[in-house]
Amino acid sequence: MNAEARTATDSGIPLVAVVSSYPLLAEAVEGALEGIAEVRAFPAGQGDTADFLRLLQPAAVVVDSPEEAEAAAEFAREARATLVHVSLREDRLRLLHAGRWQNLSDGSASPERIRSAVAAGIYLRGVRT
C-alpha cells in the first residue's frame, strides 16, 4: 500500500488528526481545512499517541501540547507525515519538517496559518485530493 492510499480517506481526501485538550482547536482546524482534508479530533493525554497514529495513518497531525508533539513526532518521522504543534499559550506554531522543528509564527497561531502549514505539508508530500 502506498503512502497516498494509507493517508487518504475512502473519498481520497487526506486525513488530518487533531490531538488536543481543547475541542475548540479541533473545530477551528476543521473549519480552516474544509474542502482540503477530513479532520478527526481525538483527546490528548491518552498515553498512546504514537501507536494510535500508526494505526490511523493520517497525512497530517495537529497537536496542542509539548508532550503530544513529542509523541506525535515519533510517528511523523517514521511516516513522513506533517506535524504542526500549536502552542495556544504562546500563540505560536511549529512545524516538524525533515525531522527538525521550525518556528512558523510568533504571535499568530490563527486557523489560517494552521491551514497553510497543514496544506503545504500535505501537498509537498504528494498526497492530492
Task: Describe the function of each predicted region.
Residues 2, 13-56, 60-128:
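Internal alpha/beta domain cores that form substrate/cofactor-binding pockets in large enzymes
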Residues 1-4, 8-9:
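Extreme N-terminal leader/targeting regions
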